[in-house]
Amino acid sequence: EFHISVWLAPGMNIHRNPLCGRNFEYYSEDPLVAGLCAAADTRGIQSHAGIGTSIKHFAANNQEDNRMYVNEHISERAMREIYLKGFEIAVKTAQPMTIMSSYNLVNGVHTANSHDLLTAAARDEWGFAGYVMTDWGTSEDMSGLFAYKYNLKYGHSTSRECVLAGNDLQMPGQK
């Protein structure tokens, strides 16, 4: 209807656990390699009119098992040098259409509710000009669509905080 297609990729998470069920979607354990590959894919995909990429899962979502329940404790240095560097490279060199936030928490804050990640880092520091979207069913009012709505150790991100943090779209969207 809108004649815009968004490829829900590339996945840019870092290979940290060989048992991660989605490592096949991610490029590398090296954030430089991940960033350069994602930027190349983004430029190629977005060279076609009306098609964009969604770099994901922003950020530090490096395990598939338990990813909706995990609170990653990461130092500022490790966050910037390992977990954000690939995203920074992709944004600065290719300007993807969208960034998708992840389900996990980083240092006690849901990534979808993190102003530090979505606005301060992505938009203000790196110059991201696209839109930010949540992963599917991340926020409380979208959770009823999915089986994992119950027994979340840290609860859901909230719609209000999603908007205040810098999300432009909560997925799945509705007409």
Predicted regions and their residues:
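Glycoside hydrolase catalytic-domain context in secreted enzymes
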Residues: 1-175
